[in-house]
UniProtKB/Swiss-Prot annotation:
Residues 104-106 are annotated as: Interaction with target base in tRNA. The lineage of its organism: Bacteria, Pseudomonadati, Pseudomonadota, Gammaproteobacteria, Vibrionales. The keyword Nucleotide-binding applies. This is tRNA-specific 2-thiouridylase MnmA. One of its GO terms (biological process) is tRNA wobble position uridine thiolation. Catalyzes the 2-thiolation of uridine at the wobble position (U34) of tRNA, leading to the formation of s(2)U34. The gene is mnmA. ATP binds at residues 18-25, 44, 134. PANTHER family: MITOCHONDRIAL TRNA-SPECIFIC 2-THIOURIDYLASE 1, TRNA 5-METHYLAMINOMETHYL-2-THIOURIDYLATE -METHYLTRANSFERASE.
Length: 377
């Protein structure tokens, strides 16, 4: 009994596990079986690859998911959500890049696909009581009448994925289980090896799911025409290079600028960082040193808000925020502008706060929700 759950009443509960072909979902299915649930797997295909493309991991992932389900003795269903993904995730992704922002499609995939389309299919077609995913996050299990389940950080602080799940409501959390959120990653791999699961040593997937191991610039260039332009220094406005497209760059970026070795106006040879984008002139603005003043922000404005309890914030409140994944918590104050927009003031200035990314708020272990960063302050 690896997880802290009462197993006495689980045998009548059906759980559909999102089987990705990775180690986390594999161990999630195993743990749920150990807890006595009726477990079935569901493999999602969210992206249609060209047959000509070298990158084609979906077939491999499906084979691994099937092998794990066979080993565990559970049925694996498959579903194609490629159309939903294109309409609700990928088109937004392209629109944001076209607007010079840096979106996070994984958050939108969780919102529109894994905890909406997947949940609806599991509910209506497979008659599930719960769905389960291999995310490193936890949820509370209410004990008092009227109490609602909360989204909590995962036990493994290095792998905690609550940042990607801030859009979930109490109702979605109530229908979801996160077995590996109670464990640290090495323990998950150990269980997979112990159970002789084919995914035990499989490398974690990295990057954006539909791009995989391909070069980001090549992939994006297929869908959005690149517009080369000048690279200017923030301090003197001096042209020191050319970029291949603003969409390929993000605030705080140091690598891939191809302007190394050039001294700034102060004669220093410090590394150059992207500190801003001038969309009107199609100019990439760079400064020297990661502490360049143009990289720093005292706060942000966020919109497209998703609070876990679905109630807008009406009064000023203090909490902590992350403006990117795996960032240390930043103490801050939230000031409501209206129901759709908030101003956030950091206790200390922060670097590389990036429009298009998500600001996610916490009260200790509890994820409160978040929104999309519209602008830096």
């Amino acid at each position: 009994m690896r997880l802290k759950r009462n197993m006495s009443d689980n045998s009548q509960k059906k759980v559909i596990v999102g089987m990705s072909g990775g180690v986390d979902s594999s161990v999630s299915a195993y743990l749920l079986l150990q807890q006595g649930y009726q477990v079935e797997g569901l493999f999602m295909k969210n992206w249609e690859e060209d047959d000509n493309e070298e990158y084609c991991s979906a077939a491999e992932d499906l084979a691994d998911a099937q092998a794990v389900c066979d080993k565990l003795g559970i049925h694996l269903h498959t579903i194609n959500f490629a159309a939903e993904y294109w309409d609700n995730v990928f088109e937004y992704f392209l629109a944001e890049y076209k607007a010079g922002r840096t979106p996070n499609p994984d958050i939108l995939c969780n919102k529109e696909i894994k905890f909406k389309a997947f949940l609806e299919f599991a509910d209506e077609v497979l008659e599930a009581d719960y769905i389960a995913m291999g995310h490193y996050t936890r949820r509370s299990f209410p004990t008092a009448e009227g109490e609602k389940p909360k989204m909590l950080r995962g036990v493994d602080s290095n792998k905690d994925q609550s940042y990607f799940l801030y859009t979930l409501s109490h109702e979605q959390i109530a229908r979801s289980l996160f077995p590996v959120g109670e464990l640290e990653k090495p323990e998950v791999r150990r269980i997979a090896e112990e159970q002789d699961l084919i995914t035990a040593k499989k490398k974690d997937s990295t990057g954006i799911c539909f791009i995989g191991e391909r070069k980001f610039t090549e992939f994006l260039g297929k869908y959005l025409p690149a517009q080369p332009g000048k690279i200017e220094t923030a301090d003197e406005g001096k042209v020191i290079g050319e970029h291949q497209g603003l969409m390929y760059h993000t605030l705080g970026q140091r690598k891939g600028l191809h302007i190394g070795g050039q001294k700034g106006g102060n004669g220093l040879e410090d590394a150059w960082y992207v500190v801003d984008k001038d969309l009107k002139r199609n100019v990439l603005i760079v400064g020297q040193g990661k502490d360049h003043p143009r990289l720093k922000s005292n706060g942000l404005v966020a919109s497209q808000l998703d609070w876990v309890d679905r109630q807008p914030i009406r009064e000023t409140m203090t909490c902590t925020v992350k403006t990117r994944y795996r960032q240390e918590d930043i103490p801050c104050t939230i000031i409501p502008i209206d129901d759709e927009n908030i101003k956030v003031i950091f206790d200390e200035p922060q670097i590389a706060v990036t429009p298009g990314q998500s600001a996610v708020f916490y009260s200790n272990e509890i994820c409160l929700g978040g929104g999309i960063i519209e602008q830096r302050i």
